[in-house]
């Protein structure tokens, strides 16, 4: 192997267009694959092809490092990768942060060597690729005879690097004046200045390598030996093991030498999901990592260095380097560069890389703590599964676990039921929730599930909450602020991203309430809350804004005064339970901690699940004999029928691929994965003759009714003296004005219908209207109807009616209860006055705005239907009024809801709920409509009634017409075939 090139960090193809550099690969004009060059020595041909593949790992690596350089450049830094990468690309945050840490670790080692006193410092980069470490440090330290950088790699690659330096005035100035070719003693030296040497050499030929070093006066006899630091950043691992070890041993034999080795490790073995994915990635590229299997861990690397002659050795994982050797100010700088929430993937990556330093003790050696308790075993079964979701939320539900959202191939908004009962069905109406992950699900009462928060990206967090009940998701009270990575048990929520109030309690009728806690938990992001009961549990782990892990365990007690009391629990082996993103349950009288990630330990099959014995302060390993090695990050854990169900989970394993964990159930039970099924519209063929009473509520529960979009009747409310004063026609005529002109619906029948227009609009004086109603009421045989729905008196064609403005003489008599008025606030759109004769039915219709109907005098029957039944109740396309003549006698498959309103009763009617009214007596009522969506969501045309459909629906209808027009000219049956297919596709959206 001729030289060594630092690694390829990505699986994407590396070629000339990506790096902008001439590649040393020789190509077949008909193929992108490297040509197996026919050498005179056929035995060398295969090795040469492998060498080409190893050289190819450089291109993508430097594209990633260039991405880091552009984004993470500090104030006085120069951009050196730009000379080698002509077409920069922005990598993902996890790739950027991973490479930043690698570069920072290698820079730390170089700085440590330069800080040692020595007559001269020589920094030798083995497998340098296009790394610009010489330029960076020469820019920092300047040209000096006491500092030399030596870059070593394949001849073709080094020639490109030298040519690039020579073309750049900036780089030429940094490295200094070149020696004339005639003065260079060895042709392997492609470039030499007083501070820089570019060298191509076969590192297996150590005798030749040493000869070159001596010719360059890099090795001298006596006491004036320079300090030589050899660096190898994911490079010598591509050499055959014996050759790599010989190189390390030769370096150790040199006086005053150091070695900084950064390469992969597999501390949890080859079967760990991340390790397995990583090794498969490099094998697929035919760039096998030869060192990692013989030296899989930091202790193994220690032994390697010691056996090869290094008297002092220190080393840590890159996770420990980030945790302990990256200063807080640098961490803060990195945090502010780009949004980031891939901590599980980041720590998995860092735990699979080590930085080993031979020749000096520059790292405080860290030993992972493993408890020496005997582990106990739980039985486990694995289902066949399609439940591959990363960052999904889950909770117990029915006979299993409901799994919502998360990342599969795409981010999901749907749910799955992982059931222990093979006969279960999972019928859930389509929801309009935004796809999300890292939210919470909690069963707040049997069969009722609360979804809270989450995010789509680290910068887009959600505050919306939803309740699943009877197969229907409904919105409920929003969180006080958006949050994700929180934990929730029952109705108790803790922590999450940038949460002002750490502890919240949820009530279905009152919403979220902040709980008091005298102790501010320092690491609330991705912490673990395990509740033994609704008022007792433990809290541990998590992370703060600087990336520090919580290393304490606290008992949690909820007092009667709605105060959270935290008390420190003395525990041993903090490295075992100091975790981010772990899940926990109380099962079999045990606190179980499952999965998560840490800086100090890459959790394996023996310690990724532990029992926390809070009485003795011990952690006890729990063996779960999974059929395959699960990756217990971004997962969920729940108890169902005394069985432990582990669901979801997995990670994007840096650039090496994606690993998904299959669900597991502990307890020898089979688990069935059931996808969401929509309620079938076709089954609604039988007549539904049942009528359900509208739910009653208290004024305190009005906000809950609103956020849950639940029709609710509020009885006997204080609406002012109007319910008494407005009984008198004389009072009304006196205070409105007998000659005030109003527009009235007049009909010779009792069933008014907007579609058939079986009424007329007549302008009457108010006194005439009241006389007409009196006459109708006096004649029990009369079939006439009179109905006033007030309009604006000043601008009836352009303004919505306002009770206070249009009827100031009586408006003072009426008031909304304070609870409602305060909640609605200044969003009121219209307040129409309604006066009608008895039995005057108003047609079935819907309003796009929420409203409350306040009954002032008389009584009124109201019939309502859920918005989803609009397809069954005679609504023409683009119309908000039904064609059904009399909905009160109409036979339908839709479920009806009814209520009879009396004076002082107030009915909340959510947007889009279909409703019709039938006064039982002469009736007066007041509506209050308010707009609760952004203004641009409503129709752009004038809408004084508030019943114009939303702008998106109007736009959608135009789009449908355009789609239908595309099928013009096709036979009718073919057109119908495809339009029906499109209609079905719309239903699934």
Curated annotation (Swiss-Prot):
Keywords: Methyltransferase, S-adenosyl-L-methionine, Transferase, tRNA processing. Residues 805-947 form the JmjC domain. It catalyses: 7-[(3S)-3-amino-3-carboxypropyl]wyosine(37) in tRNA(Phe) + S-adenosyl-L-methionine = 7-[(3S)-(3-amino-3-methoxycarbonyl)propyl]wyosine(37) in tRNA(Phe) + S-adenosyl-L-homocysteine; 7-[(3S)-(3-amino-3-methoxycarbonyl)propyl]wyosine(37) in tRNA(Phe) + S-adenosyl-L-methionine + CO2 = wybutosine(37) in tRNA(Phe) + S-adenosyl-L-homocysteine + 2 H(+). Residues 1-42 are annotated as: Disordered. SMART domains: JmjC (SM00558). InterPro entries: Cupin_8, Gal_Oxase/kelch_b-propeller, JmjC_dom, Kelch-typ_b-propeller, Ppm1/Ppm2/Tcmp, SAM-dependent_MTases_sf. GO terms for biological process: tRNA methylation; wybutosine biosynthetic process. The keyword Transferase applies. S-adenosyl-L-methionine binds at residues 102, 127, 153, 202-203, 233. PROSITE patterns: JMJC. It is an enzyme of class 2 (transferase). One of its GO terms (molecular function) is tRNA methyltransferase activity. Pathway: tRNA modification; wybutosine-tRNA(Phe) biosynthesis. Pfam families: Cupin_8, Kelch_4, LCM. Probable S-adenosyl-L-methionine-dependent methyltransferase that acts as a component of the wybutosine biosynthesis pathway. Wybutosine is a hyper modified guanosine with a tricyclic base found at the 3'-position adjacent to the anticodon of eukaryotic phenylalanine tRNA. May methylate the carboxyl group of leucine residues to form alpha-leucine ester residues. Belongs to the methyltransferase superfamily. LCMT family. This is tRNA wybutosine-synthesizing protein 4. It comes from Yarrowia lipolytica (strain CLIB 122 / E 150) (Yeast). The lineage of its organism: Eukaryota, Fungi, Dikarya, Ascomycota, Saccharomycotina.
